[in-house]
């Protein structure tokens, strides 16, 4: 009988933020996101100049955990989630650890989208979901081998999940998704009337000294 194995696995981590640490007041967090967006004129200007629909603090604010204690609570929980994911991935960090590199807010209104991209200077990337209205878009992940499939036929409709070229993860508010930063991903257009609110972040490798 033939022996078939799945090789070079791509892992996707999903859990409730509260699995590591106390629950976060989601109403307070959502209000904080809107308050920050309203006051962040530099971020608003960046979004307008770069054609980003809605709002992101990615290019304007680097100290959210210092400004708002609720973000510090989120980071404490994320540290534990990332540590659990690193254990699953069996990384050898050579005495070092993964440290939060940056964290930012995303508010996507109806019709907003975030095109395909990756995070080349980080090890682990992820998103914590604050508001996911009914019908909003999923996170779309792409098989990292896609560029090498020049002559490969397409997969049959209904192919097994692990064989599909794209995977759509539909998290709920309060969920954390983690993946390795080289994995290309996007947020398709938000068809929901309400805003899709999330907090994204990167972790980098802090080598032992």
Residue ranges and their predicted role:
Residues 1-92:
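Non-heme Fe(II)/2-oxoglutarate
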Residues 105-176:
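Catalytic core of non-heme Fe(II) oxygenases with the double-stranded beta-helix
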Residues 13, 101-103, 124-126, 197-201:
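Hydrophobic residues positioned within well-ordered beta-strands of beta-sheet architectures
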Residues 65-69, 89-93, 112-116, 127-128, ...:
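Short helix-to-loop capping/linker segments positioned immediately adjacent to catalytic or ligand/cofactor-binding
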Residues 158-209:
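Catalytic core of Fe(II)/2-oxoglutarate
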Residues 89-110:
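Hydrophobic beta-strand-centered segment that forms part of the acyl-chain substrate-binding groove
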Residues 18, 108, 129-131, 202-206:
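Solvent-exposed residues in well-ordered beta-strands and their adjoining turns
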Residues 7, 95-97, 118-122, 191-195:
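A generic structural micro-feature
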């Amino acid at each position: 009988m033939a022996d078939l194995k799945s090789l070079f696995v791509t892992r996707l981590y999903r859990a409730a933020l509260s699995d590591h640490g106390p629950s976060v007041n989601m109403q307070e967090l959502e209000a904080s996101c809107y308050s920050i967006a309203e006051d962040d004129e530099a971020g608003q200007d960046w979004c307008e100049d770069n054609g980003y629909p809605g709002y992101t603090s990615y290019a304007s604010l680097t100290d959210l955990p210092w400004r708002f204690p609720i973000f510090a609570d989120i980071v404490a929980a994320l540290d534990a989630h990332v540590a659990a994911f690193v254990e699953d991935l069996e990384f050898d960090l050579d005495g070092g650890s993964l440290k939060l590199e940056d964290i930012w807010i995303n508010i996507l209104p109806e019709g907003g989208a975030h095109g395909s991209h990756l995070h080349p200077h980080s090890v682990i990337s992820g998103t914590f979901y604050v508001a996911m209205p009914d019908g909003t878009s999923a996170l779309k992940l792409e098989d990292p081998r896609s560029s090498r499939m020049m002559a490969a036929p397409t997969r049959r409709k209904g192919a097994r999940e692990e064989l599909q070229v794209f995977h759509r993860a539909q998290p709920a508010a309060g969920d954390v998704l983690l993946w390795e930063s080289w994995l290309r991903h996007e947020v398709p257009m938000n068809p929901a009337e309400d805003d899709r609110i999330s907090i994204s972040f990167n972790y980098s490798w802090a080598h032992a000294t």
